[in-house]
Curated annotation (Swiss-Prot):
UniProt-annotated binding residues for (2R)-2-phosphoglycerate: 163, 340, 369-370, 391
UniProt cofactor note: Binds a second Mg(2+) ion via substrate during catalysis.
Stated name of the protein: Enolase
Keywords (A to Z) from UniProt: Cytoplasm, Glycolysis, Lyase, Magnesium, Metal-binding, Secreted
Gene: eno
Organism this protein belongs to: Bacillus cereus (strain ZK / E33L)
GO cellular component, one term: cell surface
Family per similarity comment: Belongs to the enolase family.
Pfam families on file: Enolase_C, Enolase_N
GO molecular function: magnesium ion binding; phosphopyruvate hydratase activity
Length: 431
């Protein structure tokens, strides 16, 4: 047993230059843990509350000193004295202290920072790497990376509607080789874009953000890059999309406006038709948030049409919330959940969501946020839970590469027992 003797939070910056919360946990044994909380750009309306100060004289109102003070003045006195290995007890105590259904009193960014820092301190105390401490002896599966190499939507200043176009190197024999494949396609894409006279600046998540003529054109240039790198689309490398359709859903009309396509007023059924058409023309294996987060009928239709052959991921739809996920499972909506630790606010609840998904035959994709830091906790979570997939950006920007590098270290440490499933991590669809 090692008792927590101090908890301290400070305001630091994320990859977009916005403030976020860093937390440190100290124990009587000398064990120490530190964690930094990520932040999203496109957020689901049902997510746990990210507490911002709203003081326009500091960081344009995006300061997090209220959340920092909540850690130092409210949470710290509550959990000092706890055994640092009592993760569930500590998380439960913070949830009860907050007392709201969405962590709106203390802020999910305050609570999550403590939750993750506690886990790091506990791992330090028992002398284990974080993935092994959290996952036990069976934590050995390296995740298939979903690499966001073209950014659009709210992640970039361009005219592409869909937020992310990803490559998935499912044909690699190891995680290390999947990273090599992804990097080679990334560099090939830069050359393709350059040759077309297109911008090769990168967006929030390290992918390119060119002004392409349509969402279809984004898929076409990626196919060209895959082939230029010496791989076969639909064999070595598949495609994925995070549509983030809530960002272009018109709440007043109840329709979808695809400005990049020059098409407005699309119904849910017409959006599903569009996805089906794209999946026939391109080797798309995963679609995230294809319909608005509240368009459950649309999601049901999408699942009926594509759910047996395409991974349909609920992000804004489920917001890493077991109640939302349970409802989706009951109604047969989607077949996968995106796992974002700051959507729900504690590690305990995050692990519960992953377990619920797996029991129902859904896949779970551990994910970063667009506002990231050098913190690589999600890499360890992906291995600890044998989640099978991770979405943590492109092959540029240190805030993204930090997670890939941590996974490379873990694979190296695991040695011969490391598992990389590639295409088999999409176990609930036919390919």
């Amino acid at each position: 047993m090692s008792t927590i003797i101090d908890v301290y939070a400070r305001e630091v910056l994320d990859s977009r230059g916005n403030p976020t919360v860093e937390v440190e946990v100290y124990t009587e044994s000398g064990a120490f843990g530190r964690a930094i909380v990520p932040s999203g750009a496109s957020t689901g309306e049902h997510e746990a509350v990210e507490l911002r100060d709203g003081d326009k004289s500091r960081y344009l109102g995006k300061g997090v000193m209220n959340a920092v003070n909540n850690v130092n003045e409210a949470i710290a006195p509550e959990i000092v004295g706890f055994d640092v290995t009592d993760q569930a007890g500590i998380d439960r105590a913070m949830i009860e202290l907050d007392g709201t259904p969405n962590k709106g009193k203390l802020g999910a960014n305050a609570i999550l920072g403590v939750s993750m820092a506690v886990a790091h301190a506990a791992a330090d105390f028992v002398g284990l790497p974080l993935y092994r401490y959290l996952g036990g002896f069976n934590a050995k599966q390296l995740p298939t990376p979903m690499m966001n190499i073209i950014n659009g939507g709210s992640h970039a200043d361009n005219n592409v509607d869909f937020q992310e176009f990803m490559i998935l190197p499912v044909g690699a024999p190891t995680f290390k080789e999947s990273i090599r494949m992804g990097a080679e396609v990334f560099h090939a894409l830069k050359a393709v874009l350059h040759d077309k006279g297109l911008n090769t600046a990168v967006g929030d998540e390290g992918g390119f953000a060119p002004n392409l003529g349509s969402n279809r054109e984004a898929l076409e240039v990626i196919i060209e890059a895959i082939e230029k790198a010496g791989y076969k689309a639909g064999e070595n490398v598949f495609l994925g999309m995070d549509v983030a359709s809530s960002e272009f859903y018109n709440k007043e009309t109840g329709k979808y406006d695809l400005a990049g396509e020059g098409r407005t007023g699309l119904t849910s059924a017409e959006m599903v038709d569009f996805y089906e058409e794209l999946c026939k023309d391109f080797p798309i294996i995963s679609i995230e948030d294809g319909l608005d987060e509240n368009d459950w009928d649309g999601h049901k239709l999408l699942t009926e049409r594509l759910g047996d052959k395409v991974q349909l991921v609920g992000d804004d739809l489920f917001v890493t919330n077991t109640q939302k996920l349970a409802e989706g499972i009951e109604k047969g909506i989607s077949n996968s959940i995106l796992i974002k630790v700051n959507q729900i606010g504690t590690l305990t609840e995050t692990f519960e969501a992953i377990e619920m998904a797996k029991r129902a035959g859904y896949t779970a994709v551990v994910s970063h946020r667009s506002g990231e830091t050098e913190d690589a906790t999600i890499a360890d979570i992906a291995v600890a839970t044998n989640a099978g997939q991770i979405k943590t950006g492109s092959m540029s920007r240190t805030d993204r590469i930090a997670k890939y590098n941590q996974l490379l270290r873990i694979e190296d440490e695991l040695g011969e027992i490391a598992v990389y499933d590639g295409i088999k991590s999409f176990y609930n669809i036919k390919r």
